[in-house]
């Protein structure tokens, strides 16, 4: 039995356990759709964010590189409901070594496509960039709304969680970090 078929069977059983009739018209294809969605939403489990940094160029650029407002969505590993928001990824190249800008967004994408915690997502992106490029500094900020806080429990829609990881010069130099935060927040 394929992975998709196993997930379909599990969703079918879940619907039954919840008191639904999985054979009624509106639910007939739901197990198949949910299985397909989960396989898509969790396809980042098959990749390493660090592997996204395949293109490295010697450009002589030694100032900050920042890609901000990278949209993402992920699934909270505690409740398997979405959280979504934006990521800001910055680094200071070492010896002028830079990567393609899309690689920063790809690292966020791969790290977010799995059952995840926002804190871990932030850490994984920062350390993938650090390990791949060995830059002078790395800073990653993730801002997200969590459906586990909006739809259930405390029910506070619109509240945002912000996580950061600072490495190298961004960890050591508060002025440099403040300058970067100003760039991030300056729309």
From Swiss-Prot:
GO terms for molecular function: GTP binding; GTP cyclohydrolase I activity; zinc ion binding. It is an enzyme of class 3 (hydrolase). Pathway: Cofactor biosynthesis; 7,8-dihydroneopterin triphosphate biosynthesis; 7,8-dihydroneopterin triphosphate from GTP: step 1/1. Keywords: GTP-binding, Hydrolase, Metal-binding, Nucleotide-binding, One-carbon metabolism, Zinc. Its EC number is 3.5.4.16. It catalyses: GTP + H2O = 7,8-dihydroneopterin 3'-triphosphate + formate + H(+). Coiled coil: none annotated. Zn(2+) binds at residues 76, 79, 148. Pfam families: GTP_cyclohydroI. The keyword Hydrolase applies. Belongs to the GTP cyclohydrolase I family. NCBIfam families: folE, PRK09347.1-2, PRK09347.1-3. Toroid-shaped homodecamer, composed of two pentamers of five dimers. This is GTP cyclohydrolase 1.
């Amino acid at each position: 039995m394929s992975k998709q078929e196993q997930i379909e069977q599990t969703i079918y059983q879940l619907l039954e356990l919840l008191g639904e009739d999985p054979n009624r018209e509106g639910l007939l294809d739901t197990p198949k759709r949910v299985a397909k969605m989960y396989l898509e939403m969790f396809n980042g489990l098959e990749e390493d964010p660090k592997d996204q940094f395949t293109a490295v160029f010697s450009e002589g650029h030694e100032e900050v590189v920042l890609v901000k407002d990278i949209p993402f969505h992920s699934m909270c590993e505690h409740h398997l409901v979405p959280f979504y928001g934006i990521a800001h990824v910055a680094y200071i190249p070492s010896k002028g070594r830079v990567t393609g800008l899309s690689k920063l967004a790809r690292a966020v994408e791969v790290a977010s496509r799995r059952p995840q915690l926002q804190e871990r997502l932030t850490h994984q992106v920062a350390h993938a960039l650090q390990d791949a490029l060995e830059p002078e500094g790395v800073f990653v900020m993730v801002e997200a709304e969590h459906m586990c806080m909006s739809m259930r429990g405390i029910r506070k829609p619109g509240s945002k969680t912000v996580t950061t990881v600072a490495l190298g010069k961004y960890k050591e130099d508060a002025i440099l970090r403040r300058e970067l935060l100003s760039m991030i927040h300056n729309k």
